[in-house]
Amino acid sequence: MVDRRKSQAGQEDGRVFLVVVDDSEELHQALYFACRRAKRLNGRIALMYCIRPAEFQHFAGVGELMREEAREQAENMLRVNSEWVHDLTGKNPMVYLREGDPRVEVINLINEDEQISILILGANTKGDSTGPLIRYLTTKGAAECPVPITIVPGNLSDEDIDRLT
């Protein structure tokens, strides 16, 4: 796994940039940054949305209805963001829909798909702390992540990102 990623990282094409899709404001910056890098390096984008199962621990019928609604919302968010990725890069992204703890599922996905060569996350710059995924991946989860992590500040404009990429 590691050897394959090392060989891909030296190439100017074939890189896959993983972006975790959620409803945060900083998703825009992370995804725009990833698209600009992928376009420049002839790479691809992978989008992952993770449905948290703890949201469905109610009565069986209500829980199942909530699960279906969450899946519809996830599929819609992936569709909308996939269209934007295609508009920015000219390529359709790889799309992953998972259920579980995002901290676990992002590591699992990276370990399963050796094409993924970098993880791009957006950071909340309006609050007092980062989100739970960034907090985890920059502390004890860092040892589990086999690819570099790029954290894009949520206060960057598209023009700022254009200059950086």
Language-model regions, residue ranges each:
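Structural beta-alpha unit
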Residues: M1-Q8, H86-L119, E159, T165
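Acidic, proline/glycine-rich short linear motifs
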Residues: S7, Y49-N76, E159-T165
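Small/aliphatic-rich secondary-structure junction motif
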Residues: S7-G61
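Conserved acidic residues
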Residues: R15, I116-I118, P146
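Short, well-ordered secondary-structure micro-motifs
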Residues: A30, Q57-A60, I107-N108, G131-P132, ...
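General small-molecule cofactor/ligand-binding pocket signal
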Residues: A46-M48, M94-R98, T150-V152
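Glycine-rich, Arg-bearing micro-motifs that act as flexible, cationic patches
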Residues: I118-A143, L156-D162
